[in-house]
Amino acid sequence: MTTTTQSEQDRVIIFDTTLRDGEQCPGATMTFEEKLNVARMLDDMGVDVIEAGYPFASDGDFEAVHEIAKRSKNSVICGLSRAAHKDIDRCAEAIKPAERGRIHTFLSTSPVHMKYKLQMEAAQVYEMVISSVTRARNHTDDVEWSAEDATRTEFDFLCRCIEAAIKAGATTINLPDTVGYAVPEEYRELFRKVRETVPNSDKARFSVHCHNDLGMAVANSMAGVAGGARQIECTINGIGERAGNAALEEVVMAMRVRQDRLPYWNRIETTMLTHASKTVSAATSFPVQYNKAIVGRNAFAHESGIHQDGMIKNAQTYEIMTPETVGVKGTSLVMGKHSGRAGLIHKMEELGYKLSRNQIEDVFVRFKALADRKKDVYDEDIEALVDEQLLHGQDQIKLMSLTVIAGTHGPQRATMKLDVDGQIRIEEAEGNGPVDAVFNCIKALVPHDAKLELYQVHAVTEGTDAQAEVSVRLSHEGRSMTARAADPDTLVASAKAYLGALNKIVAKRQRSVREDAPAVAVAG
């Protein structure tokens, strides 16, 4: 949205290429339905141009671009095409249903690309630029031309090609840093000099397309805008060839947060950024790194005691944007070995606890001991520490022994001995697999209606003797309880983790009873 301080000349077009360049990332292939879902989300969040695919590459890509073109409500739908006429014609057919369509055609212009990839002379490339843009312009008024590997192209030849492309009808000129070779000052100067040198540069919008091979894709993108570009080509989560592309969420928030140095604006609804990140991550099966800027799990998480103390007093001490701005519910104070008393007290208050000073000291000592042993300390862990302090007891359900018989034939069988509040119980159960047999055994020994929400196993270290760490999450009466356990035997770790979560439910229920909640037994 524009304001009195914003003008159209300061607007930056956001060109998302998640469905094209992003999907070219090895292993990031999306299904037809996933592409439609991502495109719908991009359209809803205010992306100006969606590069929906490369129609000539396959029938599947063509169909996806064609269907997205039919469904788009707000965005320009763009298809990529090589300089060959058959590619351009196929691209034009794919985007035809779009209310606003664009053909994006490209050709390499650097000496190394012309010699080894195209095996063409500069004069031939120049003529092909004119021919391809002219062909594309016969299909649509919105044509983008890219000088592939522009940052390694001889400047005079680059300017000649740009002038010819604009004269042939290109409305957007893209100067990609195809191999992530440029540095910000160099890239800014490239755009400034090109716009000064090319006589008809005012007839087209200039675009940046930066790869992250040296980790400077976002910085280069913003430098290009400072040099006069007014379109940024980017992807959700920065996915793309090799080290990826400039991340949409990062360039958008850089402009929002640093208006003092980056006085540009865009149409992106930033509260959808986290949702967009999760959607693309799910579609591509590419996890988002925890410390990823803007949308990473730790982007608004604080563990250091000093930082937590500052955040409790004033969030601006350690956050330059509010989490709600990007669609995150709030700041997370992550409890761990670096956390201090202030952070623990704040977390306990969030969980509804009010303890005396002596009780807090006791919980804090045991919390620090736990944090030294565990990588992450969750709300449920803190609840368990407090429950132990308030209940003056240990877990009521303890594993005494476990034997599992498994093989290639017949159902698997588990025999388990538990100490349930001082009473020894032994039971045998079958299951569809050894883990199922173990959990069925627990259900037989301790009847309950908690539902299994998560079962996850990973090796703590490498090698065949590695400990298995198992995470189990149980839901009961709208509340989830998570527990982890490690053991060289995966099945023993599984049993311990399940019982750990079940013990937390029991402790939670007992605390509710003390607070005059209805006394409903979880375990019999």
Curated annotation (Swiss-Prot):
The keyword Electron transport does not apply. It is an enzyme of class 2 (transferase). Belongs to the alpha-IPM synthase/homocitrate synthase family. LeuA type 1 subfamily. This is 2-isopropylmalate synthase. Residues 398-524 are annotated as: Regulatory domain. The gene is leuA. Its EC number is 2.3.3.13. Pathway: Amino-acid biosynthesis; L-leucine biosynthesis; L-leucine from 3-methyl-2-oxobutanoate: step 1/4. The lineage of its organism: Bacteria, Pseudomonadati, Pseudomonadota, Alphaproteobacteria, Hyphomicrobiales. Mn(2+) binds at residues 21, 209, 211, 245. GO terms for biological process: L-leucine biosynthetic process. Keywords: Amino-acid biosynthesis, Branched-chain amino acid biosynthesis, Cytoplasm, Leucine biosynthesis, Manganese, Metal-binding, Transferase. Catalyzes the condensation of the acetyl group of acetyl-CoA with 3-methyl-2-oxobutanoate (2-ketoisovalerate) to form 3-carboxy-3-hydroxy-4-methylpentanoate (2-isopropylmalate). It catalyses: 3-methyl-2-oxobutanoate + acetyl-CoA + H2O = (2S)-2-isopropylmalate + CoA + H(+). Gene3D superfamilies: 1.10.238.260, 3.30.160.270, Aldolase class I (3.20.20.70). GO terms for molecular function: 2-isopropylmalate synthase activity; acetyl-CoA C-acetyltransferase activity; manganese ion binding. Homodimer. SMART domains: LeuA_dimer. Pfam families: HCS_D2, HMGL-like, LeuA_dimer. GO terms for cellular component: cytosol. The keyword Ion transport does not apply. It comes from the Bacteria. It is found in: Cytoplasm. Its cofactor is Mn(2+). Residues 12-274 form the Pyruvate carboxyltransferase domain.
